[in-house]
């Protein structure tokens, strides 16, 4: 039994409702800027590689920026959205995510998914780190050298609703 299962059993003895992510969230792909597009000041952005290497679970301030012109052509996350890296060189890192908790929209690079939901953002980030999610993720991954989960497939992930 996973820690999440234990908490549900303890805190919700009558159980909880389970829904597909697509029923409680909008999942979309990120944009197409690259690290070479960074500038010292401009429009805030998150590159999928930062999710693995630099960022923690919760992000309040951007580390990098792109030009306003480049940003105008990008997909953006809103405060409270989850940003998930959907491409990696290993199964463990694919679907790592962060909660964008800043106070402005932020451009999101390719190889990412933006998950916009009315559910608590921190809850979602913790859920996406759970063994319950991991077992479902294993059914969605494809590739050998580069591992990927197609963002549309995330809609079928079943999630407990608190």
Q: What is the role of each PLM region?
A:
Residues 22-35, 49-81:
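Sequence-specific dsDNA recognition surfaces
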Residues 15-19, 124, 155-162:
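Amphipathic alpha-helical segments
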Residues 105-112, 119, 142-162:
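A short glycine-rich beta-alpha junction/loop motif
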Residues 3, 7-30:
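Non-catalytic DNA-recognition/assembly elements of restriction-modification systems
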Residues 47, 62, 68-129:
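A short beta-sheet element
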Residues 16-24, 43, 77, 81-83, ...:
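Short, structured motif recognition centered on aromatic/hydrophobic residues
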Residues 4-5, 15, 32-33, 53, ...:
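Short loop/beta submotifs within extracellular cysteine-rich repeat domains
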Residues 10-12, 32-33, 70-71, 101, ...:
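Short, solvent-exposed loop/turn positions at domain surfaces
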């Amino acid at each position: 039994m996973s820690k999440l299962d234990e908490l549900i059993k303890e805190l919700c003895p009558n159980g909880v409702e389970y829904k597909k992510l697509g029923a409680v969230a909008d999942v979309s792909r990120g944009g197409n800027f690259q690290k070479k597009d960074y500038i010292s000041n401009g429009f805030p952005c998150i590159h999928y590689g930062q999710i693995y290497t630099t960022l923690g679970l919760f992000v309040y301030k951007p580390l990098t920026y792109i030009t306003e012109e480049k940003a105008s052509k990008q997909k953006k996350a809103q405060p409270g959205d989850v940003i998930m890296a959907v491409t990696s060189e290993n199964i463990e890192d694919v679907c790592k995510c962060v909660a964008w908790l800043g106070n402005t929209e932020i451009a999101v690079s390719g190889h990412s998914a933006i998950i916009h939901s009315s559910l608590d953002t921190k809850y979602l980030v913790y859920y996406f780190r759970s063994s319950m999610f991991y077992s479902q993720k294993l059914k969605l991954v494809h590739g050998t050298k580069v591992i990927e989960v197609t963002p549309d497939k995330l809609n079928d992930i079943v999630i407990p609703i608190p």
